[in-house]
Amino acid sequence: MAAPTLTADGPRLGQQEMKKMSPSFHPTLWGDFFLSYEAPTEAQEAQMREKAAVLKEEVRNMIKGSHDVPEIVDLIITLQRLNLDYHYEDEINEKLTVVYKSNYDGGNLDLVSRRFYLLRKCGYDVSSDVFLKFKDQLGNFVEADTRSLLSLYNAAFLRIHGETVLDEAISFTMRVLQDRLEHLESPLAEEVSSALDTPLFRRVGTLEMKDYIPIYEKDAKQNKSILEFAKLNFNLLQLRYSSELKECTTWWKELRVESNLSFVRDRIVEVYFWMSGGCYDPQYSHSRIILTKIVAFITILDDTLDSHATSCESMQLAEAIERWDESAVSLLPEYMKDFYMYLLKTFSSFENELGPDKSYRVFYLKEAVKELVREYTKEIKWRDEDYVPKTLKEHLKVSLISIGGTLVLCSAFVGMGDVVTKKIMKWVMSDAELVKSFGIFVRLSNDIVSTKREQREKHCVSTVQCYMKQHEITMDEACEQIKELTEDSWKFMIEQGLALKEYPIIVPRTVLEFARTVDYMYKEADKYTVSHTIKDMLTSLYVKPVLM
């Protein structure tokens, strides 16, 4: 694609050249908090790690000693929900083979549902026909105990296209669970309520870890070693996350956003949460830090081009990024120069940190940034010309890239270890179907909650407005129908992930993890822009340890 220029692709003379009134975003809720956050002493941390190591081996022996399918399924799902499974990948993979080969198709709805959920989530090709036996002669699902229906409900959200039985299972179980909810006791009541809000498969792993510990503690069948290890593991991860937040905050403060770029959203802690939700296991520390920095840059670009820069300034910035050279800073207005130089400096630091064997990955990252900005310039042209794409499909040709989904995935893989190859980096940048489905999901989820806010000023038309015009319906009707399209995107992502056999499981798993974070951040509101809504959650995740 040709680089954006200041001539043919630029704005008409005099158009949009008055400096815009930037929207008023609330200031940072965190400031320097993580720069002065006091972690436990080295002696305290060493004691925690020593105890955790003992418990880790106890749980390992439990996994090795599990033989019956029901026992294996329950144990692995519990470890996944408590975010302990990454400690036992080899042992769990061995047990998953046992579960898969069992071909269990008995009449226990709870077990059939949980087995299906576990295997499909872990990438196994299992048939949804196992649920047909739980229908009556009229084709309706037969009522069962609440625990079994909850398991069926959670399993059904791993549906792909053509699985009518799972579509029907969701409708049936949702209605019954809603009717029964007020009559349930703890902890089942909390489980059902949480599932109706967000099905188990769609929950952000770090949040599920935090939220499930107190539920598991109330479970009559809880194992004390697993519970204690889960609490220690949470607290140790919290120390790691807090340390990474200190590093990211230090990096962010160097940019002096509050004085140099006061019109952008100052959300470094929220960015870290959003991005770490996509790769939260401890071994992905480098990915989390790279992701946080990249999405902080995306935020600056988005807020600058959307709401502050003139069209001419926007094209100047786009050309400078296309050139990707310090000499291009001369193209820019003063307020953009520090940001541009810091962008280049940060990318150079990525190359140095990755070393000679992995620094090639940063090339793909640069190309993803350039591609993002090229699509931004197309949206600026739409805005300046008051152009509304005729169809949603036309809009998405531009906006599924400009939302940044490809760049996020590229950033995640750049920071991972030897599992990521040049083949994977090329795949991310190649318009792969799974990457496109993810981009569409992010775009539609974003636009549902941001359209009303953004249209208070002159702004590029959203997918919602495009859909309204295409189908001659109201905004509320368009949002409801687009929500159905996001459900379609979930189906696409799951089936495309299952089909991606030539790549390691971490590839489709990472895409789905980021889909979960997007679902959370855009559910009901834009929690990134209006981050008061998640302040308490972030405090419980990064500041308050779990009581032992």
Swiss-Prot record:
pH dependence: Optimum pH is 7.0. Higher pH values favor the formation of (S)-beta-bisabolene.
Up-regulation conditions: Up-regulated by herbivory and fungi (e.g. Fusarium spp., C.heterostrophus, F.verticillioides, R.microsporus and A.parasiticus).
Phosphoprotein is among the record's keywords: no
Superkingdom of the source species: Eukaryota
Cofactor: Mg(2+); Mn(2+)
Tissue-specificity statement: Expressed in roots. Not detected in leaves, unless damaged by herbivory or infected by fungi.
Motif mapping: DDXXD motif: 302-306
Residues noted as binding substrate in the record, renumbered to the chain: D302, D306, R443, N446
Residues where Mg(2+) 3 binds: N446, S450, E454
Cofactor binding: number and manner: Binds 3 Mg(2+) or Mn(2+) ions per subunit.
Pathway(s): Secondary metabolite biosynthesis; terpenoid biosynthesis
Keyword Lipid biosynthesis: no
UniProt GO molecular function: (4S)-limonene synthase activity; isomerase activity; magnesium ion binding; myrcene synthase activity; S-linalool synthase activity; terpene synthase activity
Record remark: domains: The Asp-Asp-Xaa-Xaa-Asp/Glu (DDXXD/E) motif is important for the catalytic activity, presumably through binding to Mg(2+).
Other facts noted in the record for this chain: In the presence of magnesium, the product spectrum is shifted toward an increased production of (S)-beta-bisabolene and a decreased production of (S)-beta-macrocarpene.
Database matches in PANTHER family: ALPHA-HUMULENE_(-)-(E)-BETA-CARYOPHYLLENE SYNTHASE (PTHR31225:SF93), OS04G0344100 PROTEIN-RELATED (PTHR31225)
Protein name listed in UniProt: (S)-beta-macrocarpene synthase
Organism: Zea mays
Gene giving rise to this polypeptide: TPS6
